[in-house]
Swiss-Prot record:
Gene3D superfamilies, alphabetized: Ribosomal protein L25, beta domain (2.170.120.20), Ribosomal Protein L25, Chain P (2.40.240.10)
A single BP term in Gene Ontology: translation
Annotated gene: rplY
The protein, known as: Large ribosomal subunit protein bL25
Ribonucleoprotein among keywords: yes
Taxonomic placement: Bacteria, Pseudomonadati, Pseudomonadota, Alphaproteobacteria, Rickettsiales
Length: 203
């Protein structure tokens, strides 16, 4: 589960390109919160602070307590606009979290892929899914899904039915899908072939 980030924002009543430019000259970033059947709320954030947090891993799945005029709102980042040259945050869309569960897209981390059994035997680790869509308890939103693939053999696929998800999370589809495969290169040995050759060498 990701830690809850505490951020402060100011409400804003002036809109449009001119108002946004004026905010940025003051070192602030325009943003908006919407969703959950609520009236959208226009806010501004401190530019250096939001850019710093954006550059940390998995910001887009970061649960945030946003304080606006002494009121707290539980939100999630939805979209981030960056400056094309400096990568400084220019605008952020947030969504209100009012439901008990939230549909989330989170990154997948394949732990041990460089030293996976199939890779050691000459195979190539092929990532099919870099992100997966989950339905998560809003109090248990993971920053990522980590999968240990160290023991994955050559010429095999990693399927969703074999994945243990973080507590309070499930895939949004019941249909099985492939996340990764280890593809055999020419001359690569499958586990069975390797064992057979080892046995023959021992005779």
């Amino acid at each position: 589960m990701s830690e809850i980030l505490e951020l402060e924002a100011k409400s804003r009543t002036e809109f449009g390109t001119g108002a946004s430019r004026a905010l940025r000259r003051e070192g602030r970033v325009p943003a908006i919160i919407y969703g959950a059947g609520k009236t959208p709320v226009s806010i501004s954030l401190e530019e250096k602070e939001i850019t710093k947090y954006y550059r940390k891993p998995a910001f887009i799945s970061q649960l945030i307590n946003l304080t606006i005029d002494k009121k707290k709102y539980k939100v999630l980042p939805k979209a981030v606009e960056l400056h094309p040259v400096t990568d400084i945050v220019r605008h952020v869309d947030f969504v209100f979290l009012e439901e008990k569960t939230q549909k989330m897209e989170v990154p997948v981390v394949y732990e041990g892929k460089e030293r996976a059994l199939g890779v050691k035997r000459g195979g190539y680790f092929n990532i099919v899914k870099r992100r997966v869509t989950l339905l998560c308890d809003v109090n248990n939103i993971p920053r990522n899904v980590t999968i240990d693939v160290t023991n994955m053999p050559i010429a095999t696929s990693l399927k969703s039915s074999k994945i243990e998800l973080p507590k309070g999370c499930s895939f949004t589809t019941k249909k099985e899908f492939v996340l990764a495969t280890i593809i055999g290169r020419r001359g690569a040995k499958t586990e069975a072939e390797g064992e057979q050759q080892a046995a023959e060498a021992g005779k």
